[in-house]
């Protein structure tokens, strides 16, 4: 996508030459637009192509790709400009307006032609060959705050996707993205900083060399265990799940049976066992010692073909346990696992603490009759929402658009029974993201119907219907959502957390860090 914006920042009075000089310092600082942009994608962030001052107006031409879109970029300029000139020059910002905004989406000609006649509220749609142009005119600060631009883009992209949608959209009886419940915090939120930035500066976390990995120091580890215990006590134990220890190194054959390899093969870490040839490894070691670098090409020769993945969903071993077994749905099974990390390769999408490649979850998996499976899913979601209310955490629950077992798949050639709603996703509000109301997904409650039952040949001994379901409570994300709303001051935290944490441990002090 390409974004081309003509807009203006309107001040409370004419901008003096002295104030203009200070504003230019902000305009020339591109770091404002790079926050949250993945490494290597900086070229897709907002750029100021030209600017000029006209009395009270700062007139801007801006462009961008997908990251820090131009309409987000112009809004981001407000705060640093006010910090520069507000007090020193007694000038305020009265409004931010967009005179004209052209958003271009590239697609196949055949798909573009199918959008002919489509009406998008509050904007104009122009179709030109392989290009879809969404054109806004005279958009004010109020419309920006209502996210009409992002909604219009999502609307058009959804219309495109309908022509080639994931199986999720075909299966789901309620439109993905529909909010089914929400809760507004009773207290006033007074913390608006990025929890990742502050956690780093305080020394609660430190970036690990691997992409999307972090070292969690004692204060953060203490908070992890506090939330883990709370989720077990307030959610998992109330539904009487039994704890198991699930393997985290999953054979490729298991992933094949799950059909995970069809939907998201690019989202996993693949594991290659080494060849048992010590003399060949000695050559590798010798070369490394002499060259003082790791000879990757030689190492590749010493590895067998990929045979495993690191668990990307955490529930994989559950279905393997019942592979080609006869079960009794009158004796349903409810297991949970909290024994280790889950791994997903996010590539360039890994950012901050809320989207990582290595994360901790408490994973519940169950099997029984369709009615039982649906009731358990509803209970896991209910108790998660109850916990958020007890902690006075603002949240909403929506119909998910990416149940892990359907993600990326366009069709299923088997006679699979799917639930009306495969996935609900509960999100905690992130108040530091001001351009739009965003949340971090903390609980994912899924029903698979007969998807895994068919894949693993699981049958009821009376030939009755067997379904499965799973709910993941993402510890890493629960903590990010909590810190985003409460901040890092122990005294500001609710008693429910303090009673679990008791006393916060100290951070090891070094000369150079934190």
UniProtKB/Swiss-Prot annotation:
Keyword Ligase recorded: yes
GO biological process, one term: selenocysteine biosynthetic process
Superkingdom of source: Archaea
Pathway info: Aminoacyl-tRNA biosynthesis; selenocysteinyl-tRNA(Sec) biosynthesis; L-seryl-tRNA(Sec) from L-serine and tRNA(Sec): step 1/1
Class in the EC hierarchy, top level: ligase
Assigned keywords, A-Z: Aminoacyl-tRNA synthetase, ATP-binding, Cytoplasm, Ligase, Metal-binding, Nucleotide-binding, Protein biosynthesis, Zinc
Residues that coordinate or bind L-serine: 313, 344, 361-363
EC number(s) reported in the record: 6.1.1.11
Localisation per UniProt entry: Cytoplasm
Function in brief: Catalyzes the attachment of serine to tRNA(Ser). Is also able to aminoacylate tRNA(Sec) with serine, to form the misacylated tRNA L-seryl-tRNA(Sec), which will be further converted into selenocysteinyl-tRNA(Sec).
Subunit-level organization: Homodimer.
Protein name: Type-2 serine--tRNA ligase
